[in-house]
């Protein structure tokens, strides 16, 4: 199980927000590329990058994203504001290993098939954010009438190589999470599932390991000192 530290970027800085809401910054650090490099130096094998400005439709972190790809050698996955096939391709060509498609994929599933055909399924991840057992889009503001399992099966057929599952009810709250929807999603598809949302302790990682997820994204907990990344990374070696 991969332990994947998150680097969320807003206004050129590395931040951590509560449930993704602007103005709720819990952590603000300069030099996002340096932060990513530190996580790599501690042993992270993949790093999760989110362009929070991009998620709001602002393409102003291109230079920082490029710097991260130049300073970090482990695989990078990037999400936030990917609203076109062209921009997804730009990020892949920039050096990101995987692009994470959210609202765009749900509103236009064919884009997943097109990008998978051009770049390979392994480089296309679809993000499914769930609230009250339904997938939400557009920055978690709009609910669609499908469960994460239903959507995941659909995108598997379209050629997605993996799924990022976020339980919005717990994201950024450091309050734990519900294992049941995670296990159900893993069982619903054959492609790998990565989980994000509410992880706040090493015990959480131990429990998630039993669900069969390929990896876990950790954000607030490592920035606020609740989880030591070095200790968390030991779970990568456990079977």
UniProtKB/Swiss-Prot annotation:
It catalyses: 1-(5-phospho-beta-D-ribosyl)-5-[(5-phospho-beta-D-ribosylamino)methylideneamino]imidazole-4-carboxamide = 5-[(5-phospho-1-deoxy-D-ribulos-1-ylimino)methylamino]-1-(5-phospho-beta-D-ribosyl)imidazole-4-carboxamide. It comes from Methanothermobacter thermautotrophicus (strain ATCC 29096 / DSM 1053 / JCM 10044 / NBRC 100330 / Delta H). Pathway: Amino-acid biosynthesis; L-histidine biosynthesis; L-histidine from 5-phospho-alpha-D-ribose 1-diphosphate: step 4/9. The keyword Cytoplasm applies. PANTHER family: 1-(5-PHOSPHORIBOSYL)-5-[(5-PHOSPHORIBOSYLAMINO)METHYLIDENEAMINO] IMIDAZOLE-4-CARBOXAMIDE ISOMERASE. Its main location: cytoplasm. It is an enzyme of class 5 (isomerase). It is found in: Cytoplasm. Its EC number is 5.3.1.16. One of its GO terms (biological process) is L-histidine biosynthetic process. The keyword Isomerase applies. This is 1-(5-phosphoribosyl)-5-[(5-phosphoribosylamino)methylideneamino] imidazole-4-carboxamide isomerase. Keywords: Amino-acid biosynthesis, Cytoplasm, Histidine biosynthesis, Isomerase.
